[in-house]
Regions:
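Active-site-adjacent structural elements that line small-molecule/cofactor binding pockets in enzymes
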Residues: 2-356
Length: 356
């Protein structure tokens, strides 16, 4: 299979991209590779994942290494891929620069990554203290500068919140991979406008998403607006709700909780008494495919260019086939409009499965 994606895709460049979210925390790496191949065959346009060492719950039970998996996924599909990751503690920024440059060299134009300030559940393994959010944000910005310089082929020495001594990457891509800013708050989106090549967030109440997009754009933010959408679908409303409650109830808490807890066990502890109503605040739950299509179309109207669909269940086949046949065609006909979208207001600001 050629490494470059064939030019001239199936869909217009002006049409919204609808991608598949590959949830390493919930599905084994081998099965997830099959799932993303299935998603491509069914008609999804792209894929993304998050770089975790710890799942959000023991019930999820997985957490393969995203960077190893990405090489296999890029080599065995023609999709474009992105990954949310966190340089600065678990990873030295030169390692992220090296890994991302190598993928971009082998698969030009098909890889982006979203460097975030991190989550303690992944970063605590170093044994280093967990910094406050503002310090993590400044550390991230140093890492972004280091990574960009390394991608340009420079030899980098840097001493600050991270230390780099005479680092150089010998194989650099002709076009460096875009660095997309992950954010779940208005303040983070505004701050990211200074450095990011785009913005990625998760489904939240429409006013919050609108404010985030405005903060990013008003601050001079460039590039695409990307939305990861947590959803649950099944043959009945009851089953769809049960799937979401089982798999995603630990992801219903607003920051700083998702940033600061250290393990799946801690998340399971605070999620013990979460009910269906709270889960519905973080996950779009419906048995109706038309309802999901309407939600997704509303996100397009808000101004998002790319949607990555995360079915929160662990068995992906039925979701992939049903959404490819019934939902994706409806979403692709949606146009950004000045009319107010009819997104239902969520009851909680959901936790991201991405560093922010």
């Amino acid at each position: 299979m050629p490494l470059d994606r064939p030019s001239g895709g199936r869909y217009s460049l002006t049409m919204v991209t609808v991608g598949f979210h590959a949830s390493h925390e919930q599905i084994s790496p081998a099965q997830l590779l099959k799932d993303v191949q299935h998603a491509e065959r069914a008609g999804f346009d792209a894929a993304m994942c998050s770089d975790h060492i710890e799942p959000w719950s023991a019930r999820q039970g997985h957490s393969g290494f995203a960077w190893s998996w990405l090489g296999a996924a890029l080599a065995t599909t023609g999709l474009r891929f992105g990954v949310v990751t966190a340089p600065g503690q678990r990873y030295h920024p030169a390692i992220i620069a090296h890994a991302s440059a190598t993928l971009a060299c082998m698969f030009p134009g098909r890889f982006w990554f979203a460097p975030g300030s991190g989550e303690n559940m992944n970063e605590h393994i170093t044994g280093d203290p967990w910094p406050a959010k503002d310090l993590r944000q400044r550390r991230l910005e140093e890492c972004v500068d280091v990574i960009r310089r390394l991608h340009r082929g420079e030899e980098v020495t840097h001493r600050g919140l991270v230390t780099v001594e005479q680092a150089r990457i010998w194989d650099v891509p002709d076009s460096p991979p875009p660095l997309i800013a992950p954010a779940i708050s208005v303040d983070t989106a505004r701050r990211a406008a200074a450095w990011a090549d785009g913005l990625v967030t998760v489904n939240q109440p429409a006013p919050k998403l609108r404010d985030m997009l405005a903060a990013y754009r008003d601050g001079g933010g460039k590039g695409k607006a990307v939305l990861q959408v947590h959803l649950s679908w099944a043959g009945s409303e009851q089953e769809a709700a049960a799937i979401a409650l089982d798999q995603w109830r630990t992801n219903t808490f607003a920051p700083p909780i998702p940033w600061d807890l250290p393990s799946a066990g801690h998340f399971d502890g605070i999620g013990e008494h979460v009910g269906e109503e709270q889960v519905r605040g973080a996950v779009n739950v419906a048995a109706s495919l038309n309802a999901h299509a309407e939600w997704l179309s509303d996100y397009v109207e808000l101004g998002f260019d790319e949607l990555y669909l995360h079915f929160v269940g662990q068995q992906q086949d039925a979701f992939i086939d049903a959404f490819a046949a019934e939902v994706l065609p409806q979403v692709r006909t949606a146009d950004p409009a000045s009319t107010e979208p009819q997104l239902a207001a969520a009851t909680a600001s959901p936790a991201s499965d991405a560093p922010a």
